């Protein structure tokens, strides 16, 4: 089952990206190094749940 998730910047707390993931195969939370347009640099983005 695919679940909608958001990727939240660890510095500015802004949700910059949204994506889906398979909840059955990937049980751990995502942490990706992505570009934050507000900070204008690459930061760690952590997974949060989005309201459907």
Curated annotation (Swiss-Prot):
UniProt family annotation: Belongs to the bacterial ribosomal protein bL33 family.
Top-level taxon in the UniProt lineage: Bacteria
GO molecular function, one term: structural constituent of ribosome
Entry keyword annotation includes Ribonucleoprotein: yes
One GO BP: translation
Signal sequence annotation: none
PROSITE patterns reported in the protein's UniProt record: RIBOSOMAL_L33
Protein name as catalogued: Large ribosomal subunit protein bL33
Entry keyword annotation includes DNA-binding: no
NCBIfam families assigned to the protein according to its UniProt record, in alphabetical order: PRK00504.1, PRK00595.1, rpmG_bact
GO CC terms, sorted: cytoplasm; ribonucleoprotein complex; ribosome
Designated gene of the protein: rpmG
Keywords assigned: Ribonucleoprotein, Ribosomal protein
């Amino acid at each position: 089952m695919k679940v909608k998730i958001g990727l939240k910047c660890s510095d500015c707390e802004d949700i910059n990206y949204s994506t889906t993931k398979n909840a059955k195969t990937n049980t751990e939370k995502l942490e990706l190094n992505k570009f934050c347009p507000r900070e204008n640099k690459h930061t760690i983005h952590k997974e949060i749940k989005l309201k459907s």
